[in-house]
Amino acid sequence: MLDVNFFDELRIGLATADDIRQWSHGEVKKPETINYRTLKPEKDGLFCEKIFGPTRDWECYCGKYKRVRFKGIICERCGVEVTRAKVRRERMGHIELAAPVTHIWYFKGVPSRLGYLLDLAPKDLEKVIYFAAYMITYVDDERRTRDLPSLEAHVSVERQQIENRRDSDLEARAKKLETDLAELEAEGAKADVRRKVREGAEREMKQLRDRAQREIDRLDEVWTRFKNLKVQDLEGDELLYRELRDRFGTYFDGSMGAAALQKRLESFDLDEEAERLREIIRTGKGQKKTRALKRLKVVSAFLQTSNSPKGMVLDCVPVIPPDLRPMVQLDGGRFATSDLNDLYRRVINRNNRLKRLLDLGAPEIIVNNEKRMLQEAVDALFDNGRRGRPVTGPGNRPLKSLSDMLKGKQGRFRQNLLGKRVDYSARSVIVVGPQLKLHQCGLPKAMALELFKPFVMKRLVDLNHAQNIKSAKRMVERGRTVVYDVLEEVIAEHPVLLNRAPTLHRLGIQAFEPQLVEGKAIQIHPLVCTAFNADFDGDQMAVHLPLSAEAQAEARILMLSSNNILKPADGRPVTMPTQDMVLGLFFLTTDGALRNVKGEERSFASVAEAIMAFDAGELSLQSRVDIRFPVGTIPPRGWTPPAREEGEPEWQQGDTFRLRTTLGRALFNELLPEDYPFVDYEVGKKQLSEIVNDLAERYPKVIVAATLDNLKAAGFYWATRSGVTVAISDIVVPEAKKEIVKGYEAQDEKVQKQYERGLITKDERTQELIAIWTKATNEVAEAMNANFPKTNPIFMMVDSGARGNMMQMRQIAGMRGLVSNAKNETIPRPIKASFREGLSVLEYFISTHGARKGLADTALRTADSGYLTRRLVDVSQDVIIREEDCGTERGLKLKIAERGADGVLRKTDDVETSVYARMLAEDVVIDGKVIAPANVDLGDVLIDQLVHHGVEEVKTRSILTCESQVGTCAMCYGRSLATGKLVDIGEAVGIIAAQSIGEPGTQLTMRTFHTGGVAGDDITQGLPRVVELFEARTPKGVAPISEASGRVRIEETEKTKKIVVTPDDGSDETAFPISKRARVLVTEGEHVEVGQKLTVGATNPHDVLRILGQRAVQVHLVGEVQKVYNSQGVSIHDKHIEIIIRQMLRRVTIIESGDAELLPGELVERSKFETENRRVVQEGGHPASGRPQLMGITKASLATESWLSAASFQETTRVLTDAAINAKSDSLIGLKENVIIGKLIPAGTGLSRYRNIRVEPTEEAKAAMYSAVGYDDIDYSPFGTGSGQAVPLEDYDYGPYNQ
C-alpha cells in the first residue's frame, strides 16, 4: 500500500500504449459482464476474475482453492489468483484495439493540442480522424524529383494518346454521319429527318470531346497534385486519391483515421519544428507570431518532458477496475450497472467486429466505417458528448463517461476527495440551553451513548463491570444504569465539535464540553447563536467527536467556544448578548426620570442595603439614589471626586465613594469584572457592544467568558422580571398624522393641476410627488417618535436595539409611505395607512411586489454568495503564514486621524478596518522621542495614544508589500483578528480571508440601482459589484481616466462626444469617446493629472494598473470592495481583501525573454520570474522583462502551479489535459492538494514543525528528579543471593499478578 507521507510531489503525464499494457493484468476480449444464471463473472469479460482478481476473499473461480493458506497461488484450472477481493478495486485490464484511435481530449479540447503540434486546423483534423479525408504521411521527395522528367514524359504520352483516341473517334463518327446522310438523301428523306440525324451526331461528337477533355483535365489535376504533394496534405476527394495512388503510389504514403496521425507523429521532428517556430517568433509579426508562440508552447512541452506525442494516439484502451464500475442486483432480480460498462461494451463489440472484418478481408469502405465507429465508441468512453450527440442510455439520458466521473460537484474530485463522510458523527434539532456555560452544550443521552460507545465499553471493562468488550457491548445495548454513570465519567472534559450548515466561516464549527440532557434535542448556548447564525425554528446541527489526544487538545485549545469570542473578519466580539438579554439589561439600567418611581433621592450605605429596600418594595430599580460603593470599586470614567471638607484626606483611587445612580445600574456593575470602571449610563445594544469590545481588548479570555455568562443570566432574568409585552394598544398612532397628511395632499393636488395644465412634464410630476410624499412620511415618523412614551414596550425594544428599527415602527404606527413597482421605479402614490390602521385593497396589492422580491432576491443571493466564497477560497488557499519576518522595509502609509473643521484631531472612520491590528513598519518619533517603536501591534490603546500625540498617519506592514517567497510572513500580516495576538506560523490566513469576505456576501443586495435623475444610468452595486472587482472585469459604463497630465478639450458632434487630453510634455493627444448621457467631471480647458477620472462611473482596474501602476490598483480595489461592504454596514478588515488582491497580482506577463528560459507572452509566477532573472544576471546574460498582470480570481485559481488544485476547481478536463502534456509536478504546497491525496494539510498543527515534536526534560528537570530520590530510598536487591541458574520464563513464579 502506498503511504502518502513518503512522497513529496505528484506528477501527471501522458500514458503510452506500453504503459497501459504494463498496468494491465490481462486483456478483456468479450463484452459480457456476468452470467445471469450463476451470477458469476464471465471469463475474459468485463468482470473476469482471472484478470481483475477473485470476487470472494481467498477463493478462486472454480472453488478448487479456498482459505487463506493458499494465498498467492494461481489456480491451474481457472487461472485466478487466490488473494483478497479488494484487489478488484485496483487491478486494471486493457482492450487491444484492431486500429489505433486518437484520444479525444487532445484532439477536441480547446485549443486542440494535436492541431497545434501538427499545425492542422481542428476541422481538417476531424476529417482525417473520422475517415472523411486522406492524409499524406510520407513523400519520397528525392525519388520524385529524380523521376519527374520521365514521369512528365509518360504523362504527356498519355495525354497525347487520349487526344489521338479522341481525334480518331471523332473522325470515325464524322464519316458515319456522311454515310448516313448520303443514304437518307438517296432515299429522298425530308430535310427535317436529315437535320435530326445531324444534330444527334453532333451531340455524340460533343460528348466524345467532353469526355476526352475531362480525362485530360483529370490527368492534369492528378499530375499537378502529385508534383506539389507534401507531407500532411489532405485529400478529401476519394477518387482523385485513388487515381494518385494507382499512378504514383510508390512515391508517397497516405492513409485515413488515427493511423495516419500515428504515422505522422512517429516521423515528426520536434527539435526542427521548435527551431522553425523560434525563427518565426523572432522575425514574424501579428497573427503569425501569436500562433507560433502558442504552437511553441505545445512543442516545447513535449521536448522538455519525457512525454511522447505518440501518447495522443492509442493502440489499446485501459479498463478500470471492476469495483469502480460495479454491477449490483436489485430486488426484482434485475441489475443496475455503471454507465461505464455500457460504454466499454460498445468499444469491445465494435473492436471485435473490426477484427473479424479485417480477418475476412472486407472491402475498405466497410472497414473504414467500422474504424470510424470504433473511434466514436472510444471518444464516448473518454468524454461522452464532447463531439456530436452523446450516447444515451434508457430514457434518453446521456451516459456518464470517464471525464464525467471527474467533473463537477458530483465528480471524483469534489464529491469523494475533497468532501468525505466521517464516522463518529450525529445530527439533531437544536434548542436553547440558557442554563449552560459559554463552553458547554447539551447532548441527548442516547446520542452521547452512541457517540462515545467505544470509550464507554473500554471503561466498563476497566472497572470490571464487564469481562470483555463483547459483554460490555451487550450492557450498552441493553441500557443498564451503570452504563450512564460510566458515560458521565467518560464525557467529562472530552470536547465535541458542533457544526451548523452552511459553514460560512470558521466559527461555523466550534468545540464544546458536552453535558448530558434528557430528550432528543441538542442544547446550545444562546450567545453562540450569532456565530453559527442559528435560531431555534427547527435548525439542525451536526456533532463530531475528536478521538485522538491531539485532536482533543486542538479542539479544547483552538476551537472551544470561549476561546472564539472574536470574529476573524474584523477582530471584534461576535459573542454578544442579543434580543431578550439586551432588553433585560436595558430595563435594568434605564433611568426612572420620566416615571413615577418609588424611593427617589434616598441614600444607602451599600448596595446590599439598597437591595434590601428593593426586596421590601420600598425602592424601584430605576430610582435615582445615592449609594456608597466599597473599597476597590473604580468610579465611572470622567468622575470627579466631590469637594472635600476641611481636615478630610484627599480622595485616592480605591477609596470608597458615593455616587448618584440607580440600583439597577449598581446590579449591572456587579456582573462586570471588579476592576472595570463603573458604568453609569443606559445600556442598550450599542453600549453593550462597546463594553464587550473593551473587555475583549483588555481582559483574559476566562474573565471575558465568565462576564458574558453573567450578562446572559442577568439579561434573561430581568427581561422576564420587566414584564415587557406587546399589545395592540401599545401601537400609538400620532394624533397629528391626519393634519400632516391633509397638508401634503393639498400639495399633491397642486402638482397634479400643474401637470394637467401642461406646465410640467410627466417625469417632473413623478419626481415632485415622490419628494412631497417622502417628506410627508418623514414628518409622520417624527411625530410618531415624539408621541411614543419612553416606557412603551415596543419603543423600548427598538430603543434598546433588542429588535426592530424605526423604519419598521414607522410602518406599524405611522404610514408605510412609497413603494416600488416591478420595474424598480417608485410609485408616486404613497400608502397612507399604517399596519395598525389597516391597508386598503389597492394599498395591500401594490405593497406585495416588494415583499415577494425580497424573498426571491435572498434565494438568489445565497447561491451567488456561496459561489463567490468558493472562488475566493480557491484563489487564496495556499496563503499560509510561513515565517516570522520576511525582513522587508516596505510598508503602507495609512491615515489614522484627520482634523475636523474645529481643528481638533479625530480618529478616521475606517481606522477599525485599515490600521487596527497591523504592525508598525517604523518607529513613530515626535520631537526626537520614540512614542511607538517599530514592529509593535497597533491596538485600540496605542492608536488612541498616537492620536493624542497629534500623529495623523503611520507606516504599517502589509501583505501587499510582503517579500516572502511562499505564503506570507507573520509581521506583514500582523495581529490574528480571531485571537487578538500576533498570528501564529502555519495559520491559513488565505482561507480566513476568503471566509471573511464571502460570509457577509448574503447580506449584500443583488439589484443594480438606477441613480436618481439619469434614467438608464445603471450602477452595479452589492454582490455583483464585488464579483466584478474580484474577477477584474471591465465594469459596465466604465469611466475613462487620463493617461497623462495635460489640458482638457471637449468635442461634441450631433452623434458623438469625446474628451481630448493634450499632454503637457507635447506628446500625442489622447481622445476618449464617451456616451452623450455620461456626466463629465472635467470642464473645457481644465488641467488634469495622470489617472484623474474624466466622467462619473467605475474605473477599469486594468487601466489603473497600466497607467498608475501596481500600488494604485491595489488601493483602488481595496477601496472599492470596502465601499460595497460599508454601504451594508458590514465590517471587514482590509488585510483580508489585500490577501485576495495579492493573489490576483501574483503573475507577470513576459514581454521580452532575453536570455531567460521564458517565452514572450507567457504568464509566470512573480517568484519564478525573479529567480530566473537572478540566475541569468549572475551568468552575465540579459534578463527578461515583464509587466504585472491583474487576473480575476477564477483565472488566477486555474493558473495555479498546482494541477491538483486547479483540476478540482473548474474545467477539470482542460486542466488535466494541459497538465499531462506538460508532465506537471505538483509539489503539494497548498491545502487542497494535500486534502486530495489524504495527507495532513501544511497549515496549523499539520506543519512538520508542530508535528515532529518530542518532549525532552531539561537538565535542571533531570537533576531535580534525581535529587528528589535519595540513595537509601531505592530498593536494590542484594547481590549474590540468587542461585545463578537460568529459569525458563514459563516456570517463573510471578506471584499473584499471573492469575
From Swiss-Prot:
Q: Which UniProt keywords apply?
A: DNA-directed RNA polymerase, Magnesium, Metal-binding, Nucleotidyltransferase, Transcription, Transferase, Zinc
InterPro entries from the xrefs?
Answer: DNA-dir_RpoC_beta_prime (IPR045867), DNA-dir_RpoC_beta_prime_bact (IPR012754), RNA_pol_asu (IPR000722), RNA_pol_N (IPR006592), RNA_pol_Rpb1_1 (IPR007080), RNA_pol_Rpb1_3 (IPR007066), RNA_pol_Rpb1_3_sf (IPR042102), RNA_pol_Rpb1_4 (IPR007083)
As for what it does, the entry says: DNA-dependent RNA polymerase catalyzes the transcription of DNA into RNA using the four ribonucleoside triphosphates as substrates.
Q: Where does Mg(2+) bind?
A: 535, 537, 539
Q: What is the lineage of its organism?
A: Bacteria, Bacillati, Actinomycetota, Actinomycetes, Kitasatosporales
What is the name listed in the Swiss-Prot or TrEMBL entry for this protein? Answer: DNA-directed RNA polymerase subunit beta'
EC number(s) reported in the record:
2.7.7.6
- Swiss-Prot/TrEMBL catalytic activity: RNA(n) + a ribonucleoside 5'-triphosphate = RNA(n+1) + diphosphate
The entry's family comment says: Belongs to the RNA polymerase beta' chain family.
- Spell out the residue ranges making up region: Disordered: 385-405
